[in-house]
């Protein structure tokens, strides 16, 4: 029995050694990633340089509940700093206790997004700011109301004068200040970022100390057999594209057809922007509707090829039905590989 255990341990050490050897090299020489991925996973870039006075005005605006119609909802109500500027409730709560129908995503690294919101309805941070301000179930206010708050609150008036000494209070410039503040919300380097940079600089001794054996195996599974990298790649661990994972609840109480609600293109039914996988440990629940609070459940859903609702039998044949993306295919994992993948996701 003892000799069998020693032999098994020797095989395991050899496997770990081989995997480390394949990754203790420059990233472009790492094992081939899944063929469907347009790019590999990448570290965060350096934070942008910002106007400090403008960002400070934006910070105060972000935390000011009186911008809302009822005076009790601020940007920070749904993007809480303590949880990675995300919302720990399944769906966000607006004025008068109204429930939204989507979970508020993290604002960390938000300046790196090409498209904003789950449905991609905005491409600019300063333009995006008007949407929650106006939305009747979020802040329920108007730009004019927001301008009045700056004029009436001493802290905001002072911050405005420092940021815009020669301008009258106006909403477009308030929105620019909010965008400037959000540009400062860069997440801290993760163990992956540290590993990548040391590997890139060929400092392999330090690279090896950045990840555990289990985390490295998880990264390998992520990039290869699990195919996570197909959609979750780049600096944000998101391809910034739109996919249907089958969680649209078509024809049911919580139906949400995603970007189709904007485009009215049948192929867009049920599609949502690929979420960032950075800061997962801080930002549960996950998915556009806050459906999951356990990463294992998400991993197992995808290992089965995603959710695949059936077309209702009574649905008129002339009507469209959202189809789960064919980029999602089932894959097999051992228990050890599943644990490793989860450990890697938790350090992002």
Residues of each region from the PLM?
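Bacterial N-terminal signal peptides
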Residues: 1-9
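Periplasmic c-type cytochrome electron-transfer domains
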Residues: 11-348
């Amino acid at each position: 029995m003892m000799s069998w255990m020693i032999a098994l341990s020797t095989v395991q050490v050899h496997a770990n050694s081989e995997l480390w050897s394949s990754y203790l090299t420059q990233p472009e020489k790492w094992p081939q990633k899944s063929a469907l991925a347009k790019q590999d996973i990448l570290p965060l870039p350096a934070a942008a340089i910002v106007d400090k006075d403008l960002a400070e005005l934006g910070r105060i605006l972000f935390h000011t509940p009186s911008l809302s119609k009822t005076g009790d909802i601020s940007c920070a109500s749904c993007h809480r700093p303590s949880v990675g500027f995300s919302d720990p409730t399944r769906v966000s709560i607006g004025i008068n206790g109204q429930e939204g129908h989507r979970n508020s995503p993290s604002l960390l690294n938000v300046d790196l997004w090409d498209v904003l919101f789950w449905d991609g309805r905005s491409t600019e941070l300063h333009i995006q700011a008007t949407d929650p301000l106006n939305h009747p179930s979020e802040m329920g206010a108007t730009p004019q109301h927001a301008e009045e708050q700056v004029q009436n609150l001493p802290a905001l008036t002072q911050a405005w004068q420092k940021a815009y000494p020669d301008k009258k209070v106006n909403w477009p410039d308030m929105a620019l200040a909010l965008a400037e503040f959000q540009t400062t919300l860069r997440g801290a380097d993760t163990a992956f970022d540290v590993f990548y940079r040391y590997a890139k600089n060929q400092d392999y001794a330090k690279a090896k100390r950045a990840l555990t054996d289990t985390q490295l195996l998880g990264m390998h599974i992520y990039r290869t057999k699990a195919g996570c990298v197909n959609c979750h790649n780049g600096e944000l661990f998101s391809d910034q594209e739109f996919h249907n994972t089958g969680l649209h609840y078509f024809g049911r109480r919580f139906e949400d057809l995603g970007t189709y609600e904007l485009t009215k293109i049948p192929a867009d039914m049920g599609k949502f922007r690929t979420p960032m996988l950075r800061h997962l440990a801080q930002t549960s629940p996950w998915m556009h509707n806050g459906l999951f609070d356990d990463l294992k459940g998400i991993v197992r859903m995808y290992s089965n090829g995603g959710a695949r609702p059936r077309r209702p039998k009574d649905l008129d044949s002339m009507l469209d039905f959202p189809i789960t993306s064919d980029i999602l295919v089932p894959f097999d994992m051992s228990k050890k590989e599943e644990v490793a993948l989860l450990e890697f996701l938790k350090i992002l």
